[in-house]
Amino acid sequence: MLVLSILAVFLVISSASAQPRIMPEDVFTPLTKGFDLMREGKYEAAQAEFKTALSRDRYNPFALNNLAAIAAQQGKLKDALSYLTDASTYAKDYPQKYQQVCFTEGLCTGVKPVKEVGNESAIAKVIAENMAKLKAKMAATPEHPVSSTPPAMEKVPAEKKGK
């Protein structure tokens, strides 16, 4: 009987720990502030808020996705892809629902989390879509080769020329 009681307690504890958790306030607040700033076109201030969220939750996919959206808007496609790659690593562990806004050209979608969780990760789908759009954009716009500047030629004094 003791074994069954212990097993029942273990099952209750494990099922309680598997329940989706609401994002901590110290992460949620800078994410929502950053989103509002991003929507207003205040990208530097928004980046600072998203980086604050990342300092408290290193792989937060909302912060990483939004940093990717800003980087893509600024033409920094490699940076955007790097952020999205990090975001995709743990996105499935974040069941929060979100509100969204699109940038012009529809390259990347910025997302604002809400204090409501779903049964599965909604942000993972957004990240996957953003990665696909970004990779297509990168393939369509190959990098321009960087021109090289040859070194200055050595000047030969006039008396040594032709000898």
Residue positions per predicted region:
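Alpha-helical tetratricopeptide repeat
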Residues: 24-38, 65
